[in-house]
């Protein structure tokens, strides 16, 4: 038996295939394994209730199959205060936040980590994220997952090296088809369950309708880059840079039939600015300013750094130069122009397979 037999790991069981296989792999590695199902949303919503009940039943079925205990905990208050309120605040300000990043920071790797250690006596927590970790020179690095299509390091850049050191990511070493194959071989209840794509913990629902419950819509003009009013939007919060669908406008009478894209949001005047064509110059930026910086395994940046950046999930890496500014912000200059750089989203930095950290995009640079 490996020396892992003295170590207790609590796996965050979501009711999905990745966390299910993670629990199995840790068992195979000799750890003492138990599961924890987190309930994070309390709003009165029958659809969500059904989905959460199904997820809990699936998590329980997997734990029964593997012969491990499943604990449950309610983090709804923490989620509301530390994730959802901030999410609404960002939308109110006309920015487009990423709730999954916030949720990982505040719930999965803070509330869960603390609860597992203090209440359940865990040495480690584990999740079904497609990332890896590496211990090197007395610190722990966060690495991209082996499966480039599923790599989730973009969503975990806010973790400290201490949090990474207390976390295990078993499926990060595998490709997704292999994870599905293992689940099928074990006849796990989640083997064929589709991946969730909704807002972290709130599930899949009609986003516009959902947001409208919490934020009053503020209709305004849709204006072309030349200043012509061509329609009305129902609220800037429903639109993001680079968006093409859902604008409700066709070609202009004398102009081209090329689709319209959102190229800017004038927050002061509540105006949505659009242009035709996916390669319109107004869609592109040469850089960005980022704030709320977090570096996984290093102190704040003291000198310019050559690395690569992603300004959204699943984007190809963009070579860039990162320069620290005086007020705990950074300026990032891309080697080539990048489309749809969106304030409120995260810019995440890499050197080869290592995720260095990132920050929130404050403004995009067009000069």
UniProtKB/Swiss-Prot annotation:
Any matching Pfam family: tRNA_Me_trans_C
Cystine connections: 103-200
Location of the active site: 103 (nucleophile), 200 (cysteine persulfide intermediate)
Superkingdom of origin: Bacteria
Record-listed ATP binding positions: 12-19, 38, 128
UniProt-recorded Gene Ontology molecular function terms: ATP binding; tRNA binding; tRNA-uridine 2-sulfurtransferase activity
Gene Ontology biological process: tRNA wobble position uridine thiolation
Region ranges (Interaction with target base in tRNA): 98-100
EC number(s) stated in the UniProt entry for this protein: 2.8.1.13
InterPro entries per the UniProt record, alphabetical: MnmA-like, MnmA-like_C, MnmA-like_central, MnmA-like_central_sf, Rossmann-like_a/b/a_fold
Localization terms from the record: Cytoplasm
Marked site (Interaction with tRNA) residue numbers: 129, 345
Keywords noted in UniProt: ATP-binding, Cytoplasm, Disulfide bond, Nucleotide-binding, RNA-binding, Transferase, tRNA processing, tRNA-binding
Family the entry assigns: Belongs to the MnmA/TRMU family.
Subunit and interaction comment: Interacts with TusE.
Name recorded for this polypeptide: tRNA-specific 2-thiouridylase MnmA
Lineage: Bacteria, Pseudomonadati, Pseudomonadota, Gammaproteobacteria, Enterobacterales
Gene: mnmA
């Amino acid at each position: 038996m490996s020396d892992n037999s003295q170590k207790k790991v609590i796996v965050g069981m979501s009711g999905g295939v990745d966390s299910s296989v993670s629990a199995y792999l840790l068992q195979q590695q000799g750890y003492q394994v138990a599961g924890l199902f987190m309930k994070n949303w309390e709003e009165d919503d029958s659809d969500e209730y059904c989905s959460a009940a199904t997820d809990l039943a699936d998590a329980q079925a997997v734990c029964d199959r593997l012969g491990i205990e499943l604990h449950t905990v309610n983090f709804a208050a923490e989620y509301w205060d530390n994730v959802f309120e901030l999410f609404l605040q960002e939308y109110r300000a006309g920015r487009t936040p990423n709730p999954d990043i916030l949720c990982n920071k505040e719930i999965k790797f803070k509330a869960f980590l603390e609860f597992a250690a203090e209440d359940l006596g865990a040495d480690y927590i584990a999740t079904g994220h497609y990332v890896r970790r590496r211990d090197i020179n007395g610190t722990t690095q966060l690495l991209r997952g082996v499966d480039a299509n599923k790599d989730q390091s973009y969503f975990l850049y806010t973790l400290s090296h201490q949090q990474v050191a207390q976390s295990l990511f078993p499926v990060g070493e595998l490709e997704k088809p292999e994870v599905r194959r293992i689940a099928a071989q074990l006849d796990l209840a989640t083997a064929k369950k589709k991946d969730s794509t909704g807002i972290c913990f709130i599930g899949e629902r009609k986003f516009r309708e959902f947001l409208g419950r919490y934020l009053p819509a503020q209709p305004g003009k849709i204006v072309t880059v030349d200043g012509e009013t061509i329609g009305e939007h129902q609220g800037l919060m429903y639109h993001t840079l680079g968006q093409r669908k859902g604008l409700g406008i066709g070609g202009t009478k004398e102009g081209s039939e090329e689709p319209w894209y959102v190229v800017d949001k004038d927050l002061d005047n509540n105006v949505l600015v659009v242009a035709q064509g996916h390669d319109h110059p107004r869609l592109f930026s040469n850089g960005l300013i980022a704030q709320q910086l977090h570096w996984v395994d290093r102190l704040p940046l003291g000198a310019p750094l050559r690395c690569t950046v992603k300004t959204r999930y699943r984007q190809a890496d963009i070579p860039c130069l990162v320069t620290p500014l005086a007020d705990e912000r950074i300026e990032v200059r891309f080697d080539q122009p990048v489309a749809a750089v969106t304030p409120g989203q995260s810019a995440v930095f890499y050197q080869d397979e290592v995720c260095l950290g990132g920050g929130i995009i404050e403004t995009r640079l067009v000069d």
